Regions:
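Acidic, metal-coordinating catalytic segment for phosphate/diphosphate chemistry
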Residues: 1-35, 41
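Active-site-adjacent beta-strand/loop module that shapes the phosphate/pyrophosphate-binding cleft
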Residues: 12, 40, 89, 98-120
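Short, solvent-exposed loop/turn elements at beta->coil junctions and helix N-caps
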Residues: 21-25, 95-101
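Short beta-strand micro-motifs in enzyme catalytic cores
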Residues: 32, 106-110, 132
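A glycine-rich, hydrophobic loop/mini-helix early in the fold
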Residues: 33-57, 61-64
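The catalytic Nudix box helix
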Residues: 46-47, 62-95
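NUDIX/MutT-family hydrolases
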Residues: 122-152
Length: 161
């Protein structure tokens, strides 16, 4: 079954218009994409590696995906993290950090600061083939391995200093 999105207007407000994934989004409307960074107390960030059959296959990213109809950004980020990495982040602990407007979608960036360094993951095989904890300075040395613009949004919305 195909994903159904609820489209947004240019102010990120829900329009009530339902839209099937894979069909071109009409001009002036947008769908919502969320990304959620997971950070351990020691500062390491979770990266997951995209399945090779997906666009940008084998590139690294934080958990991300499209919000489905009925979800807001926090709920979509919670679901994506749980589905892709098997990590449960309480809704109240998911922090909205900012958004970026694109031609037909918005990307909302979220952060979950884990209270513990002892986090295990359970990967969704259809979406993700590997995961690792990486220090931010290591990521900066290997930006060509990440999906485009991901680290720019991290720097804009999350990185301090």
């Amino acid at each position: 079954m195909s994903e159904i999105w609820e489209l947004l207007d240019m102010n990120r407000q829900k329009t009530g218009i339902l839209h099937e994934r894979g069909v071109k989004v009409p001009d002036g409307l947008y769908h919502l994409v969320v990304e959620i960074w997971v950070q351990k107390p020691n500062g390491d960030l979770l990266l997951t590696q995209r399945h090779p059959d997906k666009p940008l296959g084998l590139k690294w990213e934080c958990s991300r995906g499209s919000a489905v109809a009925g979800e807001d950004g926090v709920l979509a980020a919670h679901r994506e993290l749980l589905e892709e990495a098997g990590i449960f982040a309480p809704l109240d602990d998911i922090q909205f950090k900012g958004y970026t407007m694109h031609s037909h979608y918005f990307t909302e960036t979220y952060l979950y600061e884990s209270p513990t360094n002892d986090i295990t993951f359970n990967l969704q095989a259809e979406e993700v083939v590997d995961a690792k904890w990486v220090a931010p300075n290591e990521i900066e040395q290997n930006l060509d391995e990440l999906i485009p613009e991901l680290w720019d949004r991290y720097g804009k919305f999350i990185k301090v200093g």
